[in-house]
Structures are given as C-alpha cells and as structure tokens.
Regions:
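N-terminal signal peptide c-region/cleavage motif recognized by signal peptidases
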Residues: 13-15
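Domain-level detector of nuclease and nuclease-like folds
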Residues: 90-271
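Generic hydrophobic, helix-prone segments enriched in Leu/Val/Ile
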Residues: 2, 32, 86, 154-156
C-alpha cells in the first residue's frame, strides 16, 4: 500500500470516528425534551443529557431504556450528511458500555433509537446520534424497513403539520433472559417502540414492532396504545393532561414524497 493511500485512510478514519465527545449536560437541561415530566422506569437507568436528546441508559443491558427528544419543523429538514461515526460513549465507565465491535459479524445493525435523520440540523448533535448509548441490536429488516419508515413519517408529520413534536422511542426487552451479543454482552431487544406527541394538539400516537426477519413496512400495522407500551416495558410515561393512554387515534397523514422534495430543495438531496 502506498504511503499516500495509508495516510488518506488514516485521515478518513480520524474524520469519521474521532469527533468531539463533549461531557453530558446537567439532566435538568434536558427537561425541554420531557415537558410533561420525565418518564419513570424501574430499570437501572442512568439519565444522560446530550445536546439534543435525553437517554435513559440501562448499563447492565448496554442499550437505552428510552430516549426523549424534541423535533421542531425546521430541524426535520437538516442538511448535515450522515457520518456513520459510531463510537463508544466515553461518559460511561468500562464494563458499562457497548462498542461498535460488539455488533461485528452478529447479523444485527447498530440501530439508532434517536435517528440520525432527526439530528442532521447541527453537526454536534448529528455526531452524538452515533454514540453507542443511543443504539440497540436491530435486525436489518426492522432497522431498514418499518422502523426507518416510521422515522421518515415522524419527520413528515413535523414538517407538514408545522408542529413541534416530542418523540419517545425505546427498546422492549428483558435483560435477564434476552439474547446477548459481543464481548460486552449487549442485550438484543424483543422489539422497539415509539411514542409521538404533538405539542399543539396534545395528541399522542404509539407504535411497537417486534424483532422479526420479515415484516411489512406499513407503520399502521404496529400502532398500539401508550398503555400497551407501558405494559410491554414497565415504563410510566408522562403525557399532556387529558390524553387517554388507552386510545389509538387516527394516524396523521404523511406525504413522504413531498418530504423528499422539500429536503432536496433545501439541501440538494432527498430525505
């Protein structure tokens, strides 16, 4: 290998993986992402406040219990390119965190809980979306299928309704019995969930999807109630006053084609 090519590979590797890992912020600075109150869980969760999201991280499982973040309409059309800067979270002690190597050769994606596409309006927050404390093992068909479809739909809702959303995604799992991968013993969740709250209408949609090798990409097939997710996870969610946790409201319209055109018009590329 030429010296030039070797140097180029080193530069590329450094640019992708060696970004500025800033210390977590005080947790109360993330109350903006939980305006109705923090969700309560009986799991051994460590609250970590990042620039643009709050993660309740389960160190024994080495995956998030849940994450909460705010998605403003103007931020749903971010233009910073995807970096794939997956990296272990340096704020967590040894033995309490996952690394990209834990996923290698397992057949599972390093699956985002807070999606990169919702964080691409700022370089620092885009990088922080690739912290391994924001990942869980996800089968490719789930991560790149219906889960990705839901992520795009959430962005479309923010832009097309022109409303700020509170989004709470997370994992469904049993740390004692679920499969583990990698040297660190990363728990493979049984499924994923997402709650989306419209801060103007005080409506809440909820979805849950199982880890399956094959499933349709129709997000409506995974619609559940918030109460269902509470039963699946043991988490108690704080919602706007008057929201019925047992309800399954009509899913909001989402024009993904229009979202892609808006993204291309602003950034020169599709969603």
């Amino acid at each position: 290998m030429s010296k030039f090519l070797t140097a180029l590979l080193i530069i590329v590797s450094t640019n992708v993986f060696s970004w500025d890992q800033r210390p977590p912020l005080p947790v109360q600075q993330c109350s903006f992402h939980s305006p109705y109150g923090f969700a309560a869980t009986t799991r051994q969760a460590t609250a970590i406040c990042r620039e643009a999201y709050l993660v309740a991280y389960d160190a024994p499982a080495k995956i998030p219990v849940y994450v909460a973040y705010t998605l403003k309409p103007e931020n749903a059309l971010g233009c910073f390119p995807r970096t794939n800067a997956f990296v272990a979270d340096n704020s967590l002690p040894p033995g309490k965190k996952a690394s990209p190597q834990d996923y290698a050769g397992t057949g599972y994606d390093q699956g985002h809980i807070v999606p990169d596409g919702d964080q691409s309006y700022n370089q620092q927050v885009e990088w922080e979306s690739f912290l391994m404390s924001n990942m869980s093992p996800q089968l490719p068909n789930l991560n790149r299928g219906v889960w990705k479809q839901l992520e795009s739909s959430v962005r479309a809702w923010a832009v097309q309704r022109n409303h700020t959303l509170i989004v709470i995604p997370g994992n469904i799992y049993n740390v004692a019995t679920n499969k583990k991968i990698g040297k660190s013993g990363v728990t493979v969740p049984d499924g994923l969930f997402k709650i989306v709250i419209d801060t103007q209408t005080n409506e809440a949609l909820a979805f849950a999807y199982a880890q399956k090798e094959s499933q349709p990409t129709d997000i409506s097939l995974g619609q559940v109630s918030v109460a269902d997710i509470e039963r699946y996870t043991g988490i108690t969610f704080a919602l706007p006053k008057g929201v019925d946790k047992n309800a399954k409201p009509k899913i909001w319209a989402a024009d993904l084609g229009a979202l892609g055109k808006a993204k291309k018009a602003k950034c020169g590329k599709d969603d």
